[in-house]
C-alpha cells in the first residue's frame, strides 16, 4: 500500500518564479499558480451564470409556478446546459491540469505565455457563446441539433473555446515531458497526475470530435455546405457524452487527492487503480452510443455492442475506483488508530471538514444514484421507456452535478489556502455547504427520476400541453413529485450560492494567514492543513483487521449494500418494461 499523494524531493527554490508550500513541501511555479487562479475564477463565474439559469428553469418546470414563457425557457435552458456542462466544468478541469502537472510534480509548466493565450481564447469563446444565447440568436438547446440553426458566431465561439482547451491539454503533456527530463519526481507519475493524464487524453479525443462536429456546423450555418442530421447527432454525442467522461476521470483523481489531504488515505493497489484509468481511455467514449439507442439509423448490433459490452468495461473501472477510494479512506483511518468496530473509522472521520464531507457525498451520490441509473438506462431495451423523459436529467444531475461538482467544490476548500494562501471565508457556512448542496441534489435527482417514470418529458416547457388540440393527463402523483423536486433543487441552489459566496469572498477579500495561525488551527483552515495526517509505519499495519472481509471490512459491507441496491433497481426496471408490451 502506498500513500495517495507522495512528496518528491523538492529542488532548490531560487528567484521569484517559485515558492514552496509550507504545508505540503511542494514547489509552486508562479505562472502555473496564476493560471490555476484564472481558470478557477472563470469556472466560478460560469457556475454563477449557470446556477441562476438553473433556478429559472426549476421554477418553470414546477408547474405550480411556471415562471418563464416558452421562448425564454428554451433560451435559458440552452444557456444552462452550455454554461454548466461545458464552461464551468472545463475551466475547472484546466485548473486541475495545471495543478497536476506543475505543483504535484514540482515542475515548471511549459510555455506560460501560451497558457494565457489559451485562457484568453477560451474566455472569448465562452463570452461569444453567452452573448449569442442571451440575445436570442441561439435558441437551439445545448445539443443544437440540425436543422435548428444558430448564429454563426455561436458555433465560432464554441470552436474558440474547444481549441483553447485542446491547447491546454497539449501544454499539459509538454509539462510532463519537462518534469521527466528535469527529474523533478521519482519513479512513475503520482496516481493523481496519472488520473489527470487520463482526463487529458479523453479530452483530446473529445475535442477532436467537437471539431468534426462544430466546424462543419459553422460552415453549414453560413450556407456553404449541407449536413446530415443523423451524422451530426452521432458526432455530437461523441463530443457531448465524452466531455462528461473527462469529468469522471478528473473527479476520480480529485477523490484520491482529497482522501490523501483530509485523512491520509492509502492506495490499495497502484496497478489496479491505474488499470481502471486505462479502461476509461479505451472504453468510456463508446458509452456515447446510449444517447442514440432509439435512433433508427444505427443497427441493433452496433447499439448492443457499444452499450452492453464495451460500456461495461468503463463501468468496471468506475466500480474499481468506487471500492478503492473508500477502502483507502478506511485503511488510512484505521492506520491512525480509528479502528473500533466495523464503522468506528466513519464515526471518527472529520465531518466538519468541507473537503472530506464533499469527498464522501460525491462518492455516495455518484455511485448509488448516478452510477446505478446510468448503467440501467444505458441498456438498449430499458432505454426505450427512459429516452427523453425526466429520468435522463435525473441521472446526469446525480453524476455531473452531485458527483463531479461536489468533488470540485471539496477541492476548492483546499486550493484557497494552498494556492491563494487565504483563509476560507464564512467557515461555518462552508462546513454546512456540502450537506445542503448534496442533500438538495439527492432529493432533486431522485424525484426528477420518479417523475420521469410517469412519463414526464425532459426539455419541455408545459407538460399539460395547454391550448393544444389534444390533452395529456399525467398521474396525480406527478404534481407532488415535481413540487418535492423543486424544493430539493432550491435547497441545492442555496448550497451552490453559499459555495460561490465563500469562494468569491475568500479569493478577492479573504484574509491571509500566518504559519502560526495554521498550526493553531484558526477558523477558515481545513483540518487536513492544520494537522496533516501523520505518516504511517509498519507497526501501524499490524493493527489492521485480518478477517474474512480483509483490511477494509466496513467498505466491503458498503460494497455489498451497493451491489444489492444495483440488482434491485436494475431488475425492477426489467419488470417495469414488461408493463409496456402486455402479452395475452
Language-model features and meaning:
Residues 360, 439, 557-573:
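Final/C-terminal transmembrane alpha-helix of multipass membrane proteins
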Residues 569-584:
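Juxtamembrane boundary at the C-terminal end of a transmembrane helix
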Residues 2-534, 555:
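Membrane-embedded and interfacial regions of multi-pass energy-transducing membrane proteins
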Residues 531-549:
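Short, charged N-terminal extramembrane segments
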Residues 82, 245, 558, 562, ...:
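A generic structural micro-environment signature
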Residues 4, 537, 575-576:
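Acidic/proline-rich low-complexity IDRs
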Residues 544-564:
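Juxtamembrane cytosolic/matrix-side boundary and N-terminal portion
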Amino acid at each position: 500500500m502506498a500513500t495517495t499523494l507522495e512528496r518528491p524531493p523538492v529542488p532548490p527554490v531560487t528567484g521569484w518564479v517559485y515558492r514552496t508550500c509550507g504545508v505540503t513541501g511542494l514547489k509552486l511555479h508562479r505562472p502555473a499558480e496564476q493560471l490555476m487562479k484564472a481558470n478557477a475564477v472563470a469556472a466560478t463565474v460560469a457556475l454563477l451564470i449557470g446556477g441562476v439559469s438553473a433556478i429559472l428553469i426549476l421554477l418553470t418546470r414546477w408547474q405550480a409556478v411556471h415562471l418563464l414563457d416558452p421562448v425564454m425557457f428554451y433560451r435559458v435552458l440552452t444557456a444552462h446546459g452550455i454554461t454548466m456542462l461545458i464552461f464551468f466544468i472545463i475551466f475547472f478541469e484546466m485548473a486541475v491540469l495545471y495543478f497536476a502537472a506543475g505543483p504535484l510534480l514540482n515542475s515548471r509548466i511549459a510555455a506560460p505565455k501560451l497558457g494565457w493565450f489559451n485562457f484568453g481564447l477560451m474566455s472569448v469563446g465562452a463570452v461569444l457563446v453567452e452573448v449569442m444565447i442571451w440575445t436570442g440568436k441561439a435558441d437551439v438547446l445545448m445539443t443544437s441539433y440540425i436543422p435548428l440553426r444558430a448564429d454563426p458566431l455561436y458555433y465560432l465561439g464554441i470552436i474558440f473555446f474547444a481549441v483553447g482547451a485542446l491547447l491546454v491539454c497539449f501544454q499539459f503533456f509538454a509539462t510532463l515531458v519537462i518534469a521527466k527530463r528535469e527529474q523533478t519526481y521519482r519513479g512513475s507519475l503520482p496516481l493523481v497526475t496519472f488520473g489527470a493524464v487520463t482526463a487529458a487524453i479523453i479530452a483530446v479525443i473529445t475535442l477532436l470530435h467537437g471539431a468534426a462536429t462544430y466546424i462543419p456546423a459553422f460552415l453549414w450555418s453560413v450556407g456553404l455546405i449541407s449536413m446530415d442530421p443523423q451524422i451530426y447527432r452521432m458526432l455530437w454525442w461523441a463530443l457531448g457524452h465524452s466531455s462528461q467522461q473527462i469529468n469522471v476521470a478528473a473527479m476520480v483523481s480529485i477523490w484520491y487527492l482529497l482522501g490523501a489531504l483530509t485523512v491520509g488515505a492509502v492506495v490499495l493497489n497502484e496497478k489496479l487503480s491505474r488499470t481502471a484509468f486505462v479502461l476509461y481511455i479505451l472504453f468510456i467514449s463508446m458509452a456515447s452510443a446510449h444517447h442514440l439507442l432509439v435512433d433508427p439509423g444505427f443497427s441493433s448490433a452496433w447499439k448492443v455492442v457499444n452499450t452492453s459490452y464495451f460500456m461495461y468495461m468503463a463501468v468496471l473501472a468506475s466500480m474499481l475506483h468506487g471500492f478503492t477510494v473508500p477502502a483507502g479512506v478506511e485503511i488510512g483511518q484505521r492506520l491512525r488508530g480509528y479502528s473500533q468496530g466495523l464503522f468506528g473509522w466513519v464515526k471518527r472521520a472529520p465531518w466538519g471538514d468541507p473537503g472530506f464531507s464533499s469527498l464522501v457525498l460525491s462518492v455516495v451520490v455518484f455511485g448509488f444514484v448516478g452510477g446505478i441509473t446510468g448503467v440501467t438506462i444505458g441498456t438498449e431495451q430499458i432505454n426505450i421507456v427512459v429516452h427523453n423523459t425526466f429520468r435522463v436529467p435525473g441521472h446526469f444531475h446525480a453524476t455531473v452535478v452531485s458527483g463531479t461538482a461536489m468533488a470540485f467544490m471539496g477541492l476548492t476548500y483546499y486550493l484557497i489556502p494552498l494556492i491563494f494562501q487565504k483563509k476560507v471565508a464564512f467557515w461555518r457556512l462552508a462546513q454546512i455547504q456540502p450537506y445542503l448542496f448534496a442533500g438538495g441534489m439527492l432529493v432533486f435527482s431522485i424525484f426528477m427520476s420518479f417523475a420521469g417514470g410517469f412519463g414526464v418529458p425532459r426539455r419541455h416547457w408545459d407538460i399539460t400541453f395547454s391550448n393544444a388540440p389534444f390533452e395529456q393527463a399525467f398521474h396525480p402523483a406527478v404534481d407532488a413529485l415535481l413540487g418535492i423536486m423543486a424544493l430539493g433543487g432550491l435547497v441545492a441552489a442555496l448550497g451552490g450560492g453559499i459555495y460561490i459566496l465563500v469562494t468569491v469572498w475568500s479569493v478577492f477579500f479573504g484574509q491571509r494567514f500566518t504559519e502560526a495561525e495554521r498550526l493553531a488551527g484558526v477558523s477558515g483552515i481545513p483540518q487536513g492543513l492544520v494537522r496533516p495526517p501523520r505518516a504511517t509505519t509498519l507497526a501501524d499495519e499490524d493493527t489492521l483487521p485480518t478477517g474474512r472481509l480483509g483490511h477494509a471490512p466496513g467498505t466491503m459491507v458498503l460494497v455489498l449494500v451497493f451491489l444489492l441496491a444495483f440488482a434491485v433497481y436494475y431488475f425492477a426496471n426489467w419488470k417495469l418494461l414488461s408493463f409496456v408490451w402486455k402479452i395475452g
